[in-house]
């Protein structure tokens, strides 16, 4: 789970941003 520690925050933020864009479309 080292990758989750390194990339988790940024990847999760990007994914949430993408979901919000789709939800607002």
Curated annotation (Swiss-Prot):
Which GO MF terms are attached to this record?
ATP binding; isomerase activity
Q: Where in the cell is it found?
A: Cytoplasm
Q: Report the GO terms under cellular component.
A: cytoplasm
Please state the protein's primary subcellular location: cytoplasm
Which keywords accompany this UniProt record? ATP-binding, Chaperone, Cytoplasm, Isomerase, Nucleotide-binding
Instruction: Write out the catalysed reaction.
Output: ATP + H2O + a folded polypeptide = ADP + phosphate + an unfolded polypeptide
- Give disulfide pairs as residue numbers: none
The enzyme's E.C. designation: 5.6.1.7
Which domain of life does the UniProt lineage start with?
A: Bacteria
In the record, the note on similarity to other proteins reads:
Belongs to the chaperonin (HSP60) family.
State how it assembles.
Forms a cylinder of 14 subunits composed of two heptameric rings stacked back-to-back. Interacts with the co-chaperonin GroES.
Outline what the protein does: Together with its co-chaperonin GroES, plays an essential role in assisting protein folding. The GroEL-GroES system forms a nano-cage that allows encapsulation of the non-native substrate proteins and provides a physical environment optimized to promote and accelerate protein folding.
Name by which UniProt lists this protein:
Chaperonin GroEL
Q: What is the lineage of its organism?
A: Bacteria, Pseudomonadati, Pseudomonadota, Betaproteobacteria, Burkholderiales
**Annotated gene:** groEL
């Amino acid at each position: 789970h080292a990758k989750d520690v390194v990339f988790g925050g940024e990847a999760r933020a990007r994914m949430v941003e993408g979901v919000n864009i789709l939800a607002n479309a």
